[in-house]
Amino acid sequence: MKKYILAIDQGTTSSRAILFNHAGQIHGMTQQEYPQIFPAPGWVEHDANAIWHSQLAVAQQVLKEQHLSAADIAAIGITNQRETTVLWDRQTGEPIAHAIVWQDRRTAALCDQLRADGKAPLFQQKTGLVLDSYFSGTKLKWLLDHTPGARVRAERGELAFGTIDSWLIFKLSGNHVTDTSNASRTLLFNIHTKQWDDELLALLDIPHSLLPAIVPSSGIVGQTYTSLFGQSIPIAGIAGDQQAATFGQACHRPGMAKNTYGTGCFMLLNTGTQAIASHNNLLTTIGWTLGNDVDARTDYMLEGSVFMAGAIIQWLRDGLGIIQHSSDVEALATSVPDNGGVVFIPAFSGLGAPYWDPYARGTIVGMTRGSNKAHIARAALESIAYQTVDVLEAMQKDAQILLQELRVDGGAARNDLLMQFQADMLNVPVIRPVVTETTALGAAYLAGLAVAFWESKEEIATQWQMERRFEPRMTDDEHAQRLYTWHRAVQRAQAWNI
């Protein structure tokens, strides 16, 4: 029997490959960073070839380091940064421009115009998304309009569009597909019919010929070229990073929720087969589709997206230079007893849910002569938790439920100070699992189910284990005062860059 699943985890700042055994444990992991490109204020790009080369390199390297071959791998599962938009030549397989990253805000004015034209309700009803430059649709339109010759070539059927999952699968196998979870992040996909939407494509002037075929999240969608790993490996699982993390956290039942603390911060609440429309500026999105085709059972999610979480810590390191390593932030923050009145609004690229203000900008308020770098570090960590509170309050209003616990993962979930503060501000227990690499684990589980490496979701759920539980311990008065101060500071940051 083949012993491992290879998870490909393509993130915003690095590409990783992780091997999982049948117990859902990590057998080997390799990571490689690659550069982000910032050609103008508010613009963020990637070289799609740099993504491909780094991802292939770590996949090959992890097999080599563990003295394994393709014969030991039952399947590949792919998870990816979502919304990031790639446009490439079908014949050569080469990108015709840099990829536009999910953080990129260049199409904010286009979204403003579409809202002014009264199109926001149509987009929300069909896609479950707010009309924001965060999503792929307006990014793709921008590429077609601003890349010389792109629109003519697209009309001739020479070009292919995809999010990062599509791009990697094309490079691995030659197939042009995407799963329902990634498609649901494009502003072009009807989450109810589970098909590309002709009306929305026409509104954004996007040719249907560009689009990948829609496939389930769990199922064999292609075989890797034999030249890549010595023999072919089935590609059997696909999900956007946050949906994959939700699956990896075994949040398989309605009412279960997880929060991932990565570059951004993303809370997803499973609503089962019901797509709940948000009235509080959250997103309704597809979690996963399990079955032989896209008409199979689909689980929906409510999602709150926070743009800046781990990226704040990177800025403290690279922008301010007040820490040498990201892991140093907890020690610096705990060197002072509190934030000293400092509040940090990390709206470097606007504010996400529930504000959706692309014109908000990063703000630090409440500083005095007594403020120092430790207060700023502590306020930066606290801002991650505060943004999560804003999302949860909106989520509970939409779903009409009170959360019983929050499962957490991602790099910053290893920060005990942040997790305790998160429990205090949410006023619910925060639970950290033994395996915090749940994004890659979710992709592995989806692939493993497709090839019978695991038999069922129930078997997967038994593998989930708690590492630590953080109980809330803040007084009601302090809780209320802190939230009041946070919301005052948010108002200072909003609508700044108009």
Curated annotation (Swiss-Prot):
Example of a GO biological process term: glycerol catabolic process
Keywords (alphabetical) are: ATP-binding, Glycerol metabolism, Kinase, Nucleotide-binding, Transferase
**Matching InterPro entries, A to Z?**
ATPase_NBD, Carb_kinase_FGGY, Carb_kinase_FGGY_CS, FGGY_C, FGGY_N, Glycerol_kin
Residues noted as binding ADP in the record, renumbered to the chain = T12, R16, T263, G310, G411, N415
Reaction(s) catalysed by this chain, per the record, are: glycerol + ATP = sn-glycerol 3-phosphate + ADP + H(+)
Activity modulation comment: Inhibited by fructose 1,6-bisphosphate (FBP).
- Going by the record, the broad EC class of this enzyme is transferase
Q: Which domain of life is it from?
A: Bacteria
Question: Can you tell me which residues bind sn-glycerol 3-phosphate?
Answer: T12, R82, E83, Y134, D241
Q: In which pathway does it act?
A: Polyol metabolism; glycerol degradation via glycerol kinase pathway; sn-glycerol 3-phosphate from glycerol: step 1/1
Protein's job: Key enzyme in the regulation of glycerol uptake and metabolism. Catalyzes the phosphorylation of glycerol to yield sn-glycerol 3-phosphate.
- Write down what this protein is called: Glycerol kinase
What organism is this sequence from?
Herminiimonas arsenicoxydans
